[in-house]
Amino acid sequence: MSRRAATALTMATVLTLTLAGCTDSKPPKTDQSGRGPGAPGVPQSKFFNQADFDRQMAQRRIAPQGDPNTPWLQMIQPTMVDTSKYVKRGKWHLCFSNAGVGNPWRVTGLTTLKAEAKLHPEIADLTVVDAESKDDKQIADLADLQTKGCHALIVSPNTTTALTPAIERACQTGVPVIVFDRGVTTDCPVTFIHPIGGYAFGADSAEFIALKAGKGGKVLAMRLLPDVDVLENRWAAAKVIFDREGVDVVGVEFNNADLPKAKTIVADYLKRFGKIDGVWLDAGFASVAVAEAFHAANQPVPPLTGEDQQDFLALWQKEKLTAIAPTYPVYQWRTAVIAATYILSGRPVPKEWILPQVIISSDTLSDYLTPGMPPLFFSTCGCQKMPGFPKEWSGK
């Protein structure tokens, strides 16, 4: 079995449990206005919220504060909070309750978080607990960490609803709580760190595909899994763009994290329509498989979307694809540790730390392609200049 095939098989097993950042930055809310992300008569996604959509559309146009060379330190429209009551003299013990490492995005993230902690001499100890993508285990982990003398608690929740009460109990101990990646429905954490969100991701990629395919162009929407809120939000935003630009979405199909199925879907649509003018994907898992399906049909690869996975970036460069890669940046794992150091030093932090959401284009592709890294290494880690790179991230 090839290295990529083995990796893909592993991912297919776990993606149903833990998508890379598998919830959006805010807990899902349902819009009741009757407006929706689609043509008249198309049912509205239960995850769609007009206000959240409008906010993210605006945020992606706002220049973040801070140095663009360190995007993990940048922030969009921050409201700073005082942290002086959390000042801790001497060496620190940080604790991290992780939802799990069930996919390569999270593996890259955890490696990056640990490397960031090593950069701060004030951090004497870092305790990491893996919930194995199980709510019950993470709830128990959080209770156990409250007995470990943690000076700050970082949490990447497994799910929103189940973990909210456990995080509220952690906040009540007086230890500062930092939540990142996935949100909870309480504002008790000192800060909540996340990129802009799924609507921005979907709109960025759909605008590119609509521009390249043109009005009336035939576009196949390749979905990963149903009923995952961030993926639903990505598709909802894309549907808005496609409807507005007059794109003909000839099909919306789920590959269910199955690469052969993704190839079969493409082959079937090529037989039906003869030519596809673009493929929009709500996640980059199947982007390489989609390109390979066009190769098998002896057709040029049309404009398509991907993410910052090395296999896709390498194919993009090699074949000079017409592509774009919106991202869910891994560098937020760095921000979580940095926020903890700020809080324990008494430095203000944003109540909601919104990070910029990198878009990889042909012009910036070479900045993110890292030769020699594993196929599913995610290059938005901001880790390329950290001590131990590339060895610590290569899995060797």
Which positions does each model-derived feature cover?
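Extracytoplasmic "Venus flytrap"
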Residues: 34-87, 92-112, 116, 120, ...
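Flexible loop/hinge segments that line or gate small-molecule binding clefts
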Residues: 52, 161-200, 218, 309-317, ...
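Structural motif
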Residues: 78-81, 126-149, 252-272, 287-289
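Hydrophobic alpha-helical
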Residues: 155-170, 238, 250, 255-315
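Bacterial lipoprotein signal-peptidase II cleavage site
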Residues: 21-31
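Hydrophobic alpha-helical segments within soluble ligand-binding/sensing domains
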Residues: 80-81, 138, 193-219, 233, ...
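Hinge/cleft segment of the Venus flytrap/periplasmic-binding protein
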Residues: 31-92, 333-396
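An alpha-beta-alpha
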Residues: 94-95, 113-115, 203-253, 340-343, ...
